[in-house]
UniProtKB/Swiss-Prot annotation:
Any GO CC annotation of this UniProt entry: extracellular space
GO biological process: defense response to symbiont; immune system process; positive regulation of melanin biosynthetic process
Pfam families xrefs: A2M, A2M_BRD, A2M_recep, MG2, MG3, MG4, TED_complement, TEP1_CUB2
UniProt xrefs under InterPro entries: A-macroglobulin_rcpt-bd (IPR009048), A-macroglobulin_rcpt-bd_sf (IPR036595), A2M/Complement_sys (IPR050473), A2M_N_BRD (IPR011625), A2M_TED (IPR041813), Alpha-macroglob_thiol-ester_cl (IPR047565), Alpha-macroglobulin_TED (IPR011626), Ig-like_fold (IPR013783)
Protein name (record): Thioester-containing protein 1 allele R1
Reported modifications of this chain: In the hemolymph, the full-length protein is cleaved by an unknow protease into a 75kDa N-terminal (TEP1-N) chain and an 80kDa C-terminal (TEP1-C) chain which remain non-covalently linked. The TEP1-C chain contains the thioester bond which covalently binds to the pathogen surface. Cleavage is induced by bacterial infection or aseptic wound injury. During embryonic and pupal development, the cleaved form is the predominant form.
Disulfide bonding pattern of the chain: C1217-C1283, C1326-C1338, C1329-C1334
Superkingdom of the source species: Eukaryota
GO MF, one annotated term: endopeptidase inhibitor activity
Subunit and interaction comment: Heterodimer of a TEP1-N chain and an TEP1-C chain non-covalently linked. Forms a complex composed of TEP1-N and TEP1-C heterodimer, LRIM1 and APL1C; the interaction stabilizes TEP1-N and TEP1-C heterodimer, prevents its binding to tissues while circulating in the hemolymph and protects the thioester bond from hydrolysis. Mature TEP1 and to a lesser extent full-length TEP1 interact with SPCLIP1; the interaction is induced by microbial infection.
Keywords: Disulfide bond, Glycoprotein, Immunity, Secreted, Signal, Thioester bond
Name of encoding gene: TEP1
Region (May contain the cleavage site): 580-609
């Protein structure tokens, strides 16, 4: 439908010059690579034609000519002439003007300045969601358009950057190529990114084109929404707010629950609180206590927390409810902005209620002092008090006052117009507007017209013009064809000369469509979850189409992520908009006049009000389990077919909700097309299940699994609900152990949620599938869903790994016996044993790159475990010439995520700190700086200036002696401690600078000064840890003492001849040994390095990592560098595995460098024997684990737990106190972590910690595993008591609860720890079971 709207703004600026019967009209703006059209009208009755010379010229500010175009034209009497100029592509900013000179005796000279517009392209960004969780993928599209909303031919690529909330560059595409004006890509958000508002920006030729934000946060997508609105308009005299609360699922059905309403007044203090039960809709009255307003209206904050019945899911809505002093408002409606002295002026006072309805019966006195007008009157049924005022010739201003009997007061001033004539012309639309159909306009003038000229303007230029001769009539029917060139918006201007004055009128045409008439529709508005939906598209053949669909619930966060019709209008207006001035219509139209003294321009062309005109507007069927619960989907690109249409069939997700579907299209010729508004459809079933399952449970506990049934069929039915025992993972309490399913029946009335539950125990650890099916009407209506909950061990898991490494340069045969160390007190049935054969040293590491360490990684140093190993793996894969592209891609993607994570810890001075808001650390900045520099060769996102600034900060921290001392908290004593002359930290910083070629050159003096300090300290270094790092630094520097240092280091080592192992027995043996191995590699002592490598390999964890982050970093680095020298490309060997009375064989060749072989071993196995024969390289790994109760640990921390009385069965308050037990007085631990695990059924909210001690503050709190575990980080701990209180809430029913535990440990020396168990309420089965589930004793 096309709409015609009268407007005061003309977005195409034009100029008019009229003289000697000549009218010259043209755009005032010029752009590069765009047509410029001038229209000259000859209404001179004396001359049959005029000859003119047109000159378009421009120069830069320094006088350099950039444009000089001339044209000779003639214009015949009573005709128009359209002259086109093509602006060059390379037009630049400057001073431009157009000159019109008469020729061949015709005296005429006019010139006008033109304004150069540099903006010739614009951009849009579409994101698939407004908000993302850590670990999500952000899909986005960039759309680039020219002034005609088409893909710009000259722009082939754009520069796209994504930044985190601290403006760190996380990802960039320096040459993002456009296809049909579109660039599409995605960003994998890291699992622990910086939360907050992120930014996508697009640049073209160094200037920002467009940007858009999205949010990264932890959130749960609500299944329902709550609306809070006044039941009646609140007035001060009511002294109350009456609210209506509506709660509906996104698919339209009402929600049952409890609404908690809180009213705040005066500095946001809680004044009133009420609760009410709501089923879909409810009302509540909140009364004030002497509420007095200072203004005519005041916002009152109201908070509504709606808790869904049965599930306890909660939606919180905070609203500002406006209270008014009076029941109505008033506006002055004028026939024109200004009045004409001596002529009647019509206006009206429009009274409306605050809901927009007319306010009739409002009485009061109207006074207009300037014309001595006074009356007492009442508003009519339309809320109007109509006035006709008679200003005299001398009236300068009308001051209109209204005083109501209830004290309401209003006034407004109206100014007179500076008039030059009483004549006017008017343009009115008289027909609907349709593409390629005639538009009918009525042109009316107060004088008989001999001619008038019309101009059609769109997209910054005049696209049509005409010279009409009405034969001296005051009215004329103008008919114009609505062409595609006018789309999407155009303006029509008419002008004539009446009484030596140019009078004019204009109209805006808003087509409400685009030249690319793209359309999108679906075959059903309601569809069952998981079923297929058909999309029908029509548009220009071959055009690009971008589709997106997302859960309507996401709009509760924001809706700016998507593209809408209104966005396209804003882009179009952005090219052509100018400022409005309601009192200077020529200014608003972009007009200026060039006339002789006897031809004037009318300054008031609005004689009547400009009102908008709207014209012409089966039984036994296979049950599908719902498992796909995406929040956004259908992010897809397609092309329109040759026929101009395209159909697409897609499967909708399994979520029961409402969806928004949007689509746009781009054609190179016809430009952009987009649907008018998003298509909304609902995935709903007449009968369905909603689950409310816990995140995790412990094995052996009795747990209630809660479901809710909904019936929308209009009648009550008996439902059969079946819970399945999938893979024998589940035990139904009170039922035979052999049952594979359990069915219950329940009556389900229409439109009411009916709860049903099952009491179960989990038999096996790991992920347990919960599969449930419900049916009514003998199976004609069914629903089924499957979800996974985690089954945790009742004891602590004890992982173990025995590794044997072999490297045969020639054919050999060797046997490796392995005895398993399984504790005799291990829980029965908990032992798992696996044999792995890896022909590649890093196969296990690559497999576990995304979870190398089992401990938390919530600080700036620990977080690097998500970054550095990926670099080492990529180095290794490239060094051995791996062709496994999927492994390279995995490591590269994880490297990008690790980079994202690490940027959270960057400080404003360029350094990196342990926490997000803290001082920079010398140790960590050195570590991050050198790692980032190395990573640049694999990801281009890293900002070189950022790395340089970090290393500059590092260099600035050097002591005049050459040493480096710690800055920031001490959390790694061996590295940061200053008791041994800072040798370790100084060596570490030098190592970072030496491994960075740019820093090595830039900070050569710093390096030289540091190496001098190390060489001066060399004689006194008697700690193997210090010496290992110093030796590696000397190797990197090529120092003259490097060989002496290595020999001294070797002398400090320990040798296990039976295992062919060499290591250094310090407080940090893995780091020390790894640095030593790096020095062996640098010295090319590969044979001597094999025993060192053997020992390191045998210290690895199951994931291929080492106990802590620094162990892992330097350990993997050393093994990688060594492995690069021992290529598996010559592998050709056979492996025989013997255990008990069984044997397995493996044949390995050089083609299998990335293949892992494994065998599950019976749990009662105590020893294995492995024989290897052949040539090559490999790792033999026996991975096993068992569960052990938490008893008899030797505590190195004091740990105290106290359960506090809350007076509620649903709230747990646990006071935790911990302190370090030093072996020497006043010594402190390294970084200390406290992990609190909660009993099954309990979870924490977002801010669970209170009452913490201040002496040694908590640096970070991390909520894990769905709120069932909380980790607290301390810089370190001493003998002081470090206390806090944790609050958790029971959300699920669990009986036979296993004890929970709290553990505190030193992060860099996990042998220093303490652990305590605690228990909460002793619920038994009889307290939580339904009658039919309860055992006989209940």
């Amino acid at each position: 439908m096309w709409q015609f709207i009268r407007s005061r703004i003309l977005t195409v600026i034009i100029f008019i010059g009229a003289a000697h019967g000549l009218l010259v009209v043209g755009p005032k703006f010029i752009r590069a690579n765009q047509e410029y059209t001038l229209v000259i009208s000859n209404f001179n009755s004396q001359l049959s034609k005029v000859d003119l010379l047109l000159k378009l010229e421009g120069e830069t500010d320094n006088g350099l000519s950039v444009l000089n175009v001339t044209k000779m034209v003639d214009v015949r009497r009573n005709m128009n002439r359209m002259i086109n100029f093509n602006m060059p592509e390379d037009l630049t900013a400057g001073n431009y003007k157009i000159t019109i000179d008469g020729q061949r005796g015709f005296s005429f000279h006019k010139e006008a300045e033109l304004v150069y517009l540099s903006k010739s392209i614009s951009g849009l960004i579409q994101v698939d969601k407004p908000v993302f969780k850590p670990g999500d993928t952000v899909n986005f599209r960039v759309i680039v358009l020219d002034t005609e909303l088409k893909p710009p031919a000259r722009v082939k690529s754009v520069y796209v950057t994504i930044r985190d909330p601290q403006r760190n560059v996380i990802r960039k595409w320096s040459t993002a190529k456009l296809y049909a004006g579109v660039f599409e890509s995605d960003l994998q958000i890291a699992p622990t990114p910086m939360l907050g508002v992120w930014n996508i920006s697009v640049e073209v030729e160094g200037e920002e084109l467009v940007s858009k934000t999205f949010e990264v946060k932890e959130y749960v997508l609500s299944t329902f929404d709550v609306q809070v609105m006044p039941s009646v308009i609140p007035l001060e005299e009511h002294q109350a707010v009456n609210l209506t609360i509506e709660a509906n699922y996104h698919f339209g059905k009402p929600v049952q629950g409890v609404a908690k309403v809180e009213l705040y007044l005066d500095d946001d203090k809680l004044k009133l609180k009420k609760e009410l039960t709501v089923y879909g809709k409810g009302q509540v009255e909140l009364r004030f206590d002497n509420f007095a307003m200072d203004a005519d209206q005041q916002d009152v904050p109201v908070k509504v927390s709606f808790v869904e019945q049965y599930t306890n899911r909660t939606v919180v809505k905070q609203s500002q409810i406006t209270v008014y002093r009076y029941a109505y408002r008033v506006e002055l409606i004028k026939e024109s902005p200004q009045f004409r002295p001596g002529l009647p002026f019509k206006c009206a006072l429009q009274f409306t209620h605050h809901d927009g309805t007319p306010a009739k019966g409002i009485s009061g006195k109207v006074e207009v002092s300037d014309v001595r007008f006074e009356t007492t009157t009442t508003s009519d049924n339309d809320g109007l008090i109509k006035l006709e005022l008679q200003p005299s010739e001398g009236t300068e201003q009308l001051s209109i006052h209204f005083n109501a009997v209830d004290g309401f007061f209003f006034y407004e001033d109206v100014n007179k117009v500076e008039t030059v004539t009483d004549a006017y012309i008017k343009l009115e639309l008289k027909s609907p507007i349709k593409r390629n159909k005639l538009m009918r306009f009525m042109v009316t003038c107060t004088e008989r017209m001999t001619f008038f000229v019309y101009y059609v303007m769109s997209k910054g230029n005049i696209i049509d013009a005409g010279f009409m001769r009405p034969n001296k009539q005051p009215k004329y029917l103008l008919q114009l064809n609505a062409t595609e060139k006018m789309i999407p918006r155009a303006k029509i201007l008419i002008a004539t000369v009446a009484g030596r004055t140019v009078v004019y009128d204009f109209a805006d045409l808003d087509f409400q469509e685009l030249r690319n008439n793209f359309d999108l529709s679906i075959d059903e508005q309601e569809i069952k979850p998981g079923r297929q939906i058909e999309l029908s598209m029509s548009g220009r053949p071959g055009a690009y189409v971008g589709l997106a669909a997302y859960d309507k619930a996401l709009l509760l966060f924001n809706k700016n992520h998507d593209l809408f019709w209104e966005d396209i209008g804003q882009v179009f207006d952005g090219f052509h908009a100018i400022n409005e001035n309601e009192f200077d219509i020529f200014h608003s139209l972009g007009l200026f006049a060039r006339t002789l003294d006897d031809i004037l321009f009318d300054s008031a062309n609005e004689k009547t009000g400009r009102n908008a005109l709207q014209s012409g507007k089966p039984i036994g069927k296979l049950v599908s389990y719902r498992t796909n619960f995406q929040e956004s989907w259908l992010w897809k690109n397609v092309s329109i077919g040759r026929s101009g249409s395209r159909k697409l069939i897609e499967v909708v997700p399994d979520t029961t909700t409402s969806w928004y579907l949007t689509g746009f299209s781009i054609d190179p010729v016809y430009g952009l097309g987009i649907i008018k508004k998003p298509i909304q459809f609902t995935t709903v079933q007449p009968f369905y299940i909603v689950e409310n399952l816990p995140y995790s449970i412990k094995r052996g506990e009795a747990v209630v699994l809660q479901f809710t049934l909904f019936n929308n069929l209009g009648a009550e039915y008996i439902a059969d609900v079946t819970l399945y025992n999938v893979a024998n993972q589940t035990e139904f309490v009170g039922r035979p152990n052999t049952d594979l399913s359990y069915t219950k029946s329940v009556s389900v009335p229409p439109k009411v949620g009916v709860p049903i539950s099952f009491l179960i125990k989990a038999r096996k650890l790991g992920e347990m599938a919960v599969r449930v099916k419900a049916s009514i009407m003998l199976g004609h209506e069914t629903d089924a869903l499957e979800k996974v909950i985690r089954v945790m061990p009742e004891s602590l898991v004890q992982p173990r790994m025995d590794t044997r490494f072999f490297c045969f340069d020639d054919h050999k045969n060797q046997t490796f016996p392995i005895n398993l160390d399984i504790n005799k007190k291990a829980d029965s049935g908990s032992t798992k044993i696996e044999f792995r054969l890896n022909p590649n040293l890093l196969t296990t590491v690559i497999k576990n790159l995304d979870h190398l360490l089992g401990v938390p990684t919530g600080c700036g140093e620990q977080n690097m475990v998500k970054f550095v190993p990926n670099i080492l793996v990529l180095d290794y894969l490239h060094a051995i010439g791996s062709k496994e592209q999927h492994l390279i891609d995995k490591a590269t993607n994880l490297l990008r995520q690790g980079y994202q994570n690490q940027m959270r810890y960057r400080q404003t001075d360029g350094s990196f700190g342990l926490w997000e808001t803290t001082n920079g650390s010398v140790f960590l900045t050195a570590f991050v700086g050198t790692s980032m520099q190395t990573a640049v060769k694999y990801i281009s996102d890293i900002d070189a200036a950022m790395v340089e600034k970090a290393l500059d900060w590092l260099a600035s921290k050097q002591h005049f002696s050459g040493r480096f001392d710690k800055a920031g908290a001490e959390y790694h004593k061996e590295m940061q401690g200053g008791l041994r002359n800072g040798v370790a930290l100084t060596s570490y910083v030098l190592m970072a600078l030496l491994e960075n070629d740019i820093a090595k050159a830039k900070h050569a003096e710093v390096i030289q000064k540091g190496m001098t300090y190390l060489s001066n300290q060399f004689g006194s270094i008697n700690n193997a840890y210090d010496l290992s790092i110093a030796t590696y630094a000397m190797m990197l520097n090529g120092h003259t003492m490097k060989e002496e240092a290595l020999n001294k280091l070797i002398d400090m080592s320990f040798i296990d001849a039976d295992k062919n192992e060499r290591f250094w027995n310090t407080t940090n043996p893995i780091e020390t040994t790894a640095y030593a191995l790096l020095s062996f590699v640098m010295a090319e002592k590969y044979t001597d390095g094999i025993p060192v490598m053997n020992w390191l390999v045998n210290q690895r964890y199951v994931t291929g990592s080492f106990p802590s982050t620094q162990d892992t970093f330097v350990g993997l680095k050393a093994l990688t560098k060594m492995a690069e020298k021992i290529s598996p490309s010559r592998n050709d060997y056979t492996v025989q595995l013997k255990y008990k009375k069984s044997a397995k064989y493996f044949k390995i060749n050089s083609e299998q460098i990335d293949v892992e072989n494994f065998v599950d071993i019976p749990e009662d196995t105590k020893k294995l024997e492995i024989n290897v024969g052949g040539i090559g390289f490999g790792l033999l790994e026996v991975v096993y684990q068992f569960n052990l109760n938490l008893v008899n640990f030797e505590n190195r921390f004091q740990l105290d737990l106290e359960k506090q009385n809350t007076g509620s069965d649903y709230e747990l308050r646990l006071k935790v106190c911990a302190s370090y037990i030093p072996q020497l007085t006043d010594r402190r631990s390294n970084m200390a972590l406290i992990e609190v695990t909660l009993p099954s059924g309990y979870v924490v909210d977002r801010n669970p910690i209170s009452e913490q001690t201040k002496v040694n503050p908590i640096q970070k709190t991390e909520i894990r595993y769905g709120g069932t575990s909380v980790v607290l980080y301390y810089d370190n701990m001493g003998s002081e008591r470090n206390c806090f209180t944790l609050t958790a809430y029971r959300r699920f029913k669990v009986a036979l609860k296993r004890p929970a535990y709290v553990v505190v440990y030193d992060y860099y020396n996990t042998n220093l720890n303490a652990i305590k168990v605690y228990e909460v309420d002793k619920q038994n089965l009889c307290e939580i079971c339904d009658e039919e589930d309860c055992p006989a004793e209940c």
